[in-house]
A protein has these predicted regions:
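Glycine-rich phosphate-binding active-site loops on the catalytic face of alpha/beta enzymes
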Residues: 63-72, 125, 131-138, 196-209, ...
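Active-site-adjacent beta->alpha loops and helix N-cap segments on the catalytic face
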Residues: 49, 69-86, 137-155, 179-185, ...
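Active-site-proximal loop/turn and secondary-structure-junction residues that shape catalytic pockets
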Residues: 45-49, 66-68, 100-102, 134-138, ...
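Catalytic cores of alpha/beta
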Residues: 49-51, 106-118, 179-193, 236-250
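Glycine/small-residue-rich loop that forms an oxyanion/phosphate-binding "nest" at active or ligand-binding sites
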Residues: 92-145
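Hydrophobic, well-structured mid-protein blocks that either form specific transmembrane helices
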Residues: 127-179
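C-terminal alpha-helical cap/extension of soluble enzyme domains
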Residues: 99-103, 206-210, 214-263
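Hydrophobic faces of well-ordered beta-strands that scaffold small-molecule active sites
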Residues: 41-43, 62-64, 94-98, 130-132, ...
Length: 263
């Protein structure tokens, strides 16, 4: 894992010059097109309860998890099966969270085995992709845990082969935000080399307004290029999704409030 790519740091984006103008012209509707790109809204669902309403409101992809109060954990087999069945009947896809507990993203061998078993069950239930992330302590901060990452990617590949399925999507979730900004740029190389499809990221510390993180998100998007997709999430709602998408030039957004739902 971790082939070197000779990373070049992208230049700072100038999107802030017209961002406020975009805010004034934001359109609040279920689907949108920016620069010829059709938008895909990924709804973060805690269990099945709000999945039908979210799909009806325009979500074309579901990130399915449990326990959002701790950032999301692996949902039950029954919830996965019901969600996959409903989503596929309504032209939507399902990404399943694989996370054995709340807290940090540093997993021991027992937890790794649990994750491997859970992702196997999810793949056999027909999910379209998996969502996981792993970090390890490093010099007072966090670094990408390449060994655990490699084991999970390999387990996902084995599971799809056993089910005679095509390779599925893998999203590296917001564990990515535990890395320093510069380490994130370096981690993109490793994640792309491992075959990760997309990175879900807020672009900054949890709780900060997404608008404060747009410049760094722009750097990540430039660095990733066409190797993988940067999926902005956290603090994006129907109120600001159009302006965020237009400012970053992305075609996918993630959130619990990304489509209009009744409270």
């Amino acid at each position: 894992i971790g082939t070197e790519y000779g990373l070049q740091r992208p230049k700072e984006s100038l999107f802030h010059r017209n961002f406020m103008g975009m805010c004034d012209n934001a359109r609040r509707k279920t689907s949108a097109v920016f620069g010829g790109l059709s938008m895909l809204y990924e709804f973060c669902a805690e269990n099945f309860e709000r999945v039908p309403a979210a799909i009806d409101a325009g979500a074309r992809r579901i990130e399915l998890c449990d326990n959002l109060a701790v950032g999301g954990t692996t949902p039950s087999a029954g919830v996965i099966s019901a969600t996959v069945s409903y989503a596929h009947e309504h032209d939507a896809r399902v990404m399943c969270m694989i996370r054995p507990r709340g807290g940090d993203f540093h997993y021991n061998q027992d937890e790794l085995r649990m994750m491997e078993m859970d992702l196997g069950l999810a793949v056999s239930a027909g999910v379209d992709g998996l969502v996981f992330g792993c970090c390890k302590p490093c010099a007072g901060g966090w670094a990408l845990d390449e060994l655990t990452l490699g084991a999970l990617v390999m387990a996902a590949g084995c599971a799809t082969e056993e089910c005679k399925r095509e390779p599925i999507d893998i999203t590296f979730h917001m564990a990515f935000d535990q890395l320093s900004p510069e380490a994130q740029l370096d981690a993109i190389d490793t994640l792309a080399d491992c075959g990760i499809t997309r990175i879900l990221t807020h672009g900054g510390a949890a709780g900060t307004p997404i608008e404060d993180n747009l410049e760094h998100l722009s750097r990540l998007i430039e660095c990733a290029g066409d190797r993988l997709t940067i999926l902005p999430g956290g603090g994006i709602s129907t109120a600001n999704r159009d302006t965020v998408a237009a400012a970053l030039g992305v075609s996918e957004l993630h959130g619990t409030k990304i489509v209009p739902l009744e409270v």
